[in-house]
């Protein structure tokens, strides 16, 4: 029901006369992690993950009625997600492993935006949903210098979806500098060789991005 209301609002904005629209290039840095839960407390204590620094790059289309600060944004973004991992547990596996898991997604975000103009400077906030498709992935274990290419068993294994929100500043209606928090809702668990397996894993990304509008 909520998604229907979002699409209805976007359709209403598109049909509004005097629509002001811009196409832009978006680039940024991702600080990605995975939220994991384990069924055993000792495994949970021995396994933890930190942020993986990645990238995002793509196109965005922003539109709003000229007499209103409310509008929408849609994009096509290449986004690198994943996490670093550290496993040190003598009780469970008598081993130490460190490395990172990397997933490269093509994402389509759909956001409602509100912009407040203050002369040549503007501030904006947004929120919405996204859908992603994993193009490739790998797990690198640095302690053993091995790389495992991610194998996706089905189309659904490549999919990710969730919500995002953020805010930023805009200069001359051309340059936008902002931050975004993205939280996945789909369980993206996949096997990592010789490591304990979580019961659930979802993507979380904090990104800092720059947009140039034409």
Predicted region positions:
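Glycine- and aromatic-enriched membrane insertion/assembly motifs of diderm outer-membrane
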Residues: 24, 40-95
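Transmembrane beta-strands of outer-membrane beta-barrel pores
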Residues: 29-33, 63, 78-82, 107, ...
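Short glycine/proline- and aromatic-enriched beta-strand/turn motifs that initiate or cap beta-hairpins
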Residues: 21-62, 120, 134, 143, ...
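Flexible, solvent-exposed loop segments that connect beta-strands
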Residues: 34-49, 82-103, 135-157, 187-201
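Outer-membrane beta-barrel strand-turn architecture
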Residues: 19, 63-67, 116-119, 171-173, ...
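Repeated loop/turn-to-beta-strand initiation elements of outer-membrane beta-barrel proteins
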Residues: 23, 68-72, 120, 173-179
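Residues that define the transmembrane beta-barrel architecture of outer-membrane proteins
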Residues: 51-55, 102-108, 159-163, 202-206
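Outer-membrane beta-barrel "beta-signal"
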Residues: 173, 200-214
């Amino acid at each position: 029901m909520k998604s229907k209301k979002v699409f209805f609002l976007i359709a209403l904005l598109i049909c509004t006369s005097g629509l002001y629209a811009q196409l832009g290039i978006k680039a940024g840095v991702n600080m990605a992690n995975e939220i994991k839960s384990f069924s055993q407390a000792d495994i949970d204590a021995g396994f933890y993950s930190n942020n993986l620094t990645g990238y995002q790059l793509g196109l965005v289309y922003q539109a709003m009625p000229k007499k209103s600060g409310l509008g929408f944004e849609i994009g096509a973004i290449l986004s690198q997600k994943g996490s670093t991992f550290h496993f040190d547990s003598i009780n469970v596996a008598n081993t130490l492993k460190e490395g990172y898991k990397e997933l490269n997604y093509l994402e389509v975000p759909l956001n409602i935006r509100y912009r407040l103009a203050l002369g040549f400077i503007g501030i904006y906030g947004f929120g919405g949903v996204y859908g992603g498709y994993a193009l490739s992935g790998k797990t690198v274990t640095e302690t053993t210098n091995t790389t495992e290419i991610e194998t996706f068993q089905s189309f659904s294994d490549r999919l990710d979806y969730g919500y995002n929100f953020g805010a930023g500043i805009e200069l001359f209606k051309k340059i936008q500098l902002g931050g975004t928090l993205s939280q996945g809702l789909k369980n993206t668990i996949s096997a990592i060789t010789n490591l304990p397996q979580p019961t659930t894993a979802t993507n979380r990304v904090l990104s800092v991005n720059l947009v140039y509008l034409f």
